[in-house]
Amino acid sequence: METHPSIVDTAIASLKKYAVFFKTEITDISAQDLAVEAKLNSLDRIRAGMADVTSETTDQFIPQMLNLDLLDFISFKKGCYTGQEVVARAHYLGAVKRRMYLLALATDSVPASGQTLSNSEGKQLGTIVNAEANEQGQVEALAVLSTSSTEIKTVVLDQTETSVELLNLPYELG
């Protein structure tokens, strides 16, 4: 399992609770796994539409908001986990009102994970999941937005209005 460094300790502690029921051992090998991180850096993951949940965004989203259902990272046929009923209900009723989108922001200031995106009237439009500067001096970001907010042209970040462009993800949002 790959996870963001800011939540490794929390993830391992949670998983160890279940290890007693199975013949398994859970070990943190993140210090040994530097080649994987070099191969798929943060900007590559953003462009691939693969969110990294950080300590700032833990417990803010259900899996469908991060498009994990579209990437086949969720099984709706098996398993038992906290929040399963909410996740299954959203899947079977089709009631997902927020999804993750790939954005290009015309700024050189990289917003933090968990930062709010607002419109000029101060209404919250969404939340930054991950963001990185690109080669053109802009910022590419994954952000969870209301599905009704996808026609936006500008957002307010840190009290500064910034133009925004919705980019295509490498998978369909259905």
Indicate residue ranges for each PLM-predicted region:
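Acidic, low-complexity central loop/insert segments
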Residues: 1-49
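Helix N-cap / beta->alpha transition motif
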Residues: 4, 32, 54, 146-148
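Anionic-ligand-binding alpha/beta catalytic cores of soluble enzymes and soluble regulatory domains
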Residues: 35-104
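Hot-dog-fold acyl-thioester-processing enzymes
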Residues: 20, 77-78, 122
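Residue-level signal for inorganic ion chemistry
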Residues: 1, 83, 122
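Glycine-rich, small/acidic residue-mixed loop/short-helix segments
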Residues: 66-73, 88-174
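Short, exposed beta-strand "edge-strand" segments with a Pro/Gly-rich flavor and a Y/T-containing core
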Residues: 1, 48-53, 139-145
